Amino acid sequence: MKIVFFCPPVSVINGGIKHIFRMAEALIAQGCEAVVFEQNGQRPVWFASTAPIVGQGIFSADADHLYVLPEDQPRILSDFARLPQRKVIYSQNHFYGALGIAEAADYSAYGVTDILCSSRTIYDHCRLRHPGLRAYVVPCAVDPAQFRPAAEKRNVIAFMPRKRAIEAAYIRDMFRFIYPQYRDWAWMEIAEVGEIEAAHRMGEAKVFLSLSRLEGFGLTPLEAMASGCVVAGFTGIGGREYATQDNGFWVSEDDFPAVLTALVQGVELNLAAGAALEKYHNACHKTLSSFTPEAFRKGVKDAWDIILSNK
């Protein structure tokens, strides 16, 4: 049986796409036959992957396939519901999942039997919203070989504005107004760059402003922790799964006065250095120990052993 992962266009830089490829790679390493479908048969250029790519023409009613589908695309789910093969959802954001369900009672209406969940938060949602389907947690992973501190850190605040562009501009403007003593700190935007460049920029920065929003998990703040940044900002809700008072200066969603305070706390923790900063990094390392490539591969194996044993 060939496991076929349906992937959005790989020209879009999106962490969810990366994990689709990583899961296909893990399955291949574990002895399964897995491929990634991309409508144009294109391989991503913004991260490296060894997963085989297939394009149009692979789908047929008599193919020995199992399809892994996105949670947020009702047209795709509806089209694949007509095919007799088994179907699994890979849910990486339960908020966006409401877009995919359309008017169906639950995912089983599309012939789906199992849901792979990239976080405990998504898993809990799926057990509530789709109680008749089997669900599994396959934790996201941070690659420590990729995301690590630079040899020399700079007085830089890194941020990814994709989900909160207006908020990013507002926070940056208010920060320089309220804290003029830190106007010499540079702001480094991370947008539309590949994984290697994103990791490089995080590695150089001392502080990372988390602009997470409506996340199923929110991997970027963890990548920032692995890169040696002090993280300050929003959890995006999904980030509550790992956010603690020890591993970041976290604030409630859309509390902008609080995020400005959190940001200056991150700056001043770096400037103070010493035992307090070391304690912070130790807390980050403890958090990251649950989100390793090894934990991801184990989650993949445990879930797929059950999925493939159920006909």
Task: Walk through the language-model features, giving the residues of each.
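N-terminal pre-catalytic "stem/leader" segment of glycosyltransferase-like enzymes
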Residues: M1-L66, I237-G239, G248-S252, S290-E294, ...
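Extended catalytic core of nucleotide-activated donor transferases of GT-like folds
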Residues: V35, G41-G111
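A charged, aromatic-enriched C-terminal amphipathic alpha-helix characteristic of glycosyltransferases
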Residues: L271-L308
